[in-house]
Each structure stands twice: as C-alpha cells, then as structure tokens.
Amino acid sequence: MGSDDTGGLFKWTIDALFNRDTSPSTMYDKQLQQDSFDEEIYSRPRASSFSDPDIYSKYELLRDEDEPDLLRPVSMNGLPYEKQDTNTFHARRARERRVQETPNIRRAPNPNDPIISKLFQVDEDDSQLNTNEMRSQREKFNTGRLPGKFPSPTKQYNARISNRDAFTGAERKAASTAPAIPPVAPSVQNLDYTPEYVKLMDKLSLNNKELRDLKVDVRERQKHGMEKETELKKKYLQIRQELIQELKQSKMIYDNYCKLYYKYKGVKRSIQLPTQTLASNSSMLDKIASLEKQIVDLSIEKDRLKKKSEERILSVELQKKELENKFEVERMIYERRIKDLEEKLYVHEHPIRPATDTSPVSSSSFMPHTQETSDSTASPYKEYNNTIDTQFLRNLVK
C-alpha cells in the first residue's frame, strides 16, 4: 500500500483508526531483541536484495550517490564489510536515525511524552506501564483519550478474553450460535484543554520574542563586527601605505649611501701619496715657507687696511656731525631773522598812535609781546658769528 519513501503512511492510518496492535511509532522505538551472550544482531542477508555488495562486485557496477547506504555514517562496531546487518526490516531501523533528525515527519502521539501527559492528563502510573499485556490493555480501553484513536466497530470492548485455549469446542459453538451483542463504545471524556493550550501559546510567544531579540542582537553584533572589520581594514591599508613609503625612503637612503661609498673609494684610489718624506723634499719646504710668508704679509696688510678704514669712518662721522651742527646753527639764525622781519612788518602796518585822556586804554597795550621784547631785550643770536664754533670743532677733531 504505502511505499518505503513515505514509511507506510496508509498502513499507519489504518492501524490507528482500527486500533490494531501495531502502532505507527513502533518502528521508531528501539526495541531490539538481545541474546544472552552479545547485544549484536546477526541476521541472514537476503540474496534478492539489490543492495547486496556481491551484485556490484559481480557486474562491476558503480554505487548510486543517493543510496542510503552511502549516506549512512560509518559503523563503529568493527565488523568486516561482509558481515552487515541486511535483514528484511534493516532499512527501516537504519532510517530511524535519519527520521529523528528530520523535524518535518509527524509521529503518532506517545503517552510517555511529558507534553502529551500534561495536555491530556495521563496518570504517572499509566506512564510506567512497560509490559506487553498492560500496554495492549491500555491501547484497547484508553484509545479515546488521545487524538487520532477512535473505537473500532468490529471489536467488542466488553468481552475481554485472556486465554482462548481455556474454551472447549462446545462452548465455542454455543458462543458462535448466540446472538451478537452490539459493541458499546467507551465514553469519551470532554476535557477542556484551553488553559494548557494558552500556556503553550504564551511560551511560544515568549520564545518568539526571545528569538526576535536574539536575531536583533545577532544583527547588531554582525553590523558592529562589519564596522570594526572595515575600520581595521582601513587602518591596515594606512599602515601598509606608510610602510611602503618608509621602505622607499630606506631604499633611497641606502642607494645614496652606496653611491657615496663608491665615490669615496674612487677618490681614495685616485690620490697618490708621495713616496719621499717632507724633510727630504726641499722644494716643498721652500714653497711652504713662501706661502707662510705671504700669509703673514697679507694679514699685516689686512690689519693696516682695517685700521685705515676705521680712521676714515671716524673722520667721516666727525664731518657729518660738524655739518649737522652748522646746519642747525644756520637754521636757528634764519628762523630768528624771519621773526624779526615779521615784527617789523607788523609795526609798519600798525603805527603807534598818541595816547589821549578820553581813551581808557592805551593803544600800546594791543601791540604784540614781541614788539616789547624786541627793543628792550636783545636776542643772543642777533649778532651771532659761527666762525668761533667752527674753529672749536676743528680743534676738537684734531
């Protein structure tokens, strides 16, 4: 009915609806038969299995890359390649590991699950039922307490037969001829699971909020990391450019040093030292003596010229001072002469009138002050003679 790719989905649905002994989740339960001497399962390999390695080795075929055997992790039990567990339902058991890692595959509800126990109020005593008899009894009479479990119309729930071998042939015949008792379905409890669902939704909301906060935090950290990486990259490029400039400058300095060194060696080779001593070379000594004499004469001449120039400078400065004094005296004489002429002009333009008895104030009071002092007090520069000062300065210079 159902293929191996879907895991027998139709068969699982039929088993769940009609309350068969086989549960859809039994293939995921790790219930392996154990021997007394070893926990390994040694099964006979099937000759008709297409995954038999003998077929590939016989016909020199390449294995399919999508084959589950290739994608399966490496076995750590140390068995050789020939002894593989390849019984009929080995593929289903091996697919258990892959199914557990796949969250999209839906499983039948398990009463041992703590969430199922909390939602549907499964007793702790019921969760500890591990024997086959108690498990089958729980599946028969408590199927209405889990979603997906419905009462089967073909089974009688009131007739519980524990041992079929205890009936005799007559009893079986009487039971077969008796009228059939209609099956009575167990009463289904109407429980309100709203608070549990609300709590679960609240937890999911909190988890979603924490996931969003975590996502925002991760984005901020990623953004900060990218900014820091950009800044470090910028600094790295800057330091790299500085290093390149320093290397170029160091190379230039080294090249210049090499040039100077080779130039120094060339100059050193070009200079030929004299083979004779200076004491034995009279011409060189005479030349040195003449040069020293010339140096002395030039130094004496230099001192004489320096002294002469200083005397010349002093005489020029004295002449300059003499001329400045002369110009100052002449300026004062000219200023006094101009002032006298201005006074005479004023007297000529304003003659003095005789005083009368009627006039209360004399007209002489309106004359300027210069007129009063011109006749009464003689100016010291009026009869000035610059010959005396000139002669005095000349004697001072000498």
UniProtKB/Swiss-Prot annotation:
Keyword set includes Cytoplasm: yes
Any Pfam family the entry gives: BBP1_N
GO annotation, cellular component aspect: cytoplasm; spindle pole body
Keyword Coiled coil appears in the UniProt entry: yes
Coiled coil: 201-350
Subcellular location: Cytoplasm, Cytoskeleton, Microtubule organizing center, Spindle pole body
Main localization of the protein described in the UniProt heading: cytoplasm
Keyword entries, A-Z: Coiled coil, Cytoplasm, Cytoskeleton
InterPro entries for the chain: Bbp1_C, Bbp1_N
Start and end residues of each stretch annotated as Disordered: 93-115, 351-382
Compositional bias of kind Polar residues: 356-382
Main function: Component of the spindle pole body (SPB) required for insertion of the nascent SPB into the nuclear envelope and for the proper execution of spindle pole body (SPB) duplication. Connects the central plaque of the SPB with the half-bridge. Required for proper localization of CDC5 at the SPB and for proper M-phase progression.
Subunit (UniProt): Homodimer.
Family: Belongs to the BBP1 family.
Name recorded for this polypeptide: Spindle pole component BBP1
Organism: Kluyveromyces lactis (strain ATCC 8585 / CBS 2359 / DSM 70799 / NBRC 1267 / NRRL Y-1140 / WM37) (Yeast)
Gene name of this polypeptide: BBP1
